[in-house]
């Protein structure tokens, strides 16, 4: 049984893409971790220096590094996971770069009713991963359908032009489907927070359990399950940890 589970985890393109994509995020996580450690180093003299006029520029620089890494986890996850998916899939072998581009556009279109830069933050990372996988799968399916009906090769033009023309319909349909899906959710629930369904569902779950020991144990369990699948569980459940 364990061998079957291991084989399934290794052969499933979604799990493989998440695992490989999150491995690619390690340099950014390390940068964000170091900047956070340096900013909060528990030495009074150092903290006084950062708060002074001379150290304010350094503090601003470290905060910029933190915001560009941990503060942009949703963006980094979507970019890296879709890149790993594009490299692994075998349906479209021309230009895998369309997968990251379409995934990012799909995520923005889905979350548009919420607006703002907060959609790239850690609280949206689970939602970003889900939308990335759905958009990559949808893009692959449309690529397969288009390839079965028509192959576009224009003689005498650049290779990237042909790749762009082949990706036109799949990209437009994928982004449109994600955008319409997000708009429907917004209209049904009349709440922009539903766009971040990852944090929304987790918050609804923990809201009924309160702030006692069961909530803490469940938080630890879900966090480790997410880590098992390669998802940064602590950042995904950041909205929950603020409530506990």
PLM segments and residue spans:
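Signature of multi-pass transmembrane helix bundles
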Residues: 1-29, 35-37, 53-54, 58-228
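Acidic/histidine-rich, metal-coordinating catalytic segments
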Residues: 40
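Membrane-interface interhelical connector segments
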Residues: 43-55, 238-244
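Acidic, glycine-rich loop-and-beta core segments that form the ion-binding/anion-interacting portion
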Residues: 219-244
């Amino acid at each position: 049984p364990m061998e079957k589970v291991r084989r399934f985890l290794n052969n499933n393109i979604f799990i493989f893409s998440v695992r490989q994509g999150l491995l690619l995020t390690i340099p950014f996580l390390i940068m964000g971790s170091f900047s956070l450690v340096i900013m909060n180093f528990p030495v009074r003299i150092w903290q006084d220096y950062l708060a002074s006029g001379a150290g304010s520029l350094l503090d601003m620089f470290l905060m910029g590094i933190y915001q560009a890494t941990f503060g942009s986890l949703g963006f980094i996850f979507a970019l890296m996971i879709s890149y790993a998916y594009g490299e692994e899939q075998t349906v479209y072998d021309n230009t895998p770069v369309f997968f990251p581009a379409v995934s990012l556009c799909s995520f923005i279109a889905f979350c548009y009713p919420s607006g703002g830069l907060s959609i790239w933050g850690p609280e949206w990372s689970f939602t970003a991963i889900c939308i990335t996988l759905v958009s990559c799968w949808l893009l692959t399916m449309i690529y397969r359908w288009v390839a079965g009906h028509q192959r576009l090769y224009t003689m005498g033009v650049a290779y990237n032009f042909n790749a762009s023309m082949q990706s036109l319909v799949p990209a437009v349909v994928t982004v449109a489907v994600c955008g319409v899906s997000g708009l429907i959710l917004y209209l049904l629930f009349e709440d922009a927070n539903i766009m971040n369904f990852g944090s929304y569902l987790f918050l609804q779950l923990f809201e009924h359990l309160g702030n006692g020991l069961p909530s803490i144990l469940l938080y630890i369990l879900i966090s480790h399950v997410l880590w098992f699948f390669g998802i940064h569980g602590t950042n995904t459940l950041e909205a929950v940890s603020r409530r506990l």
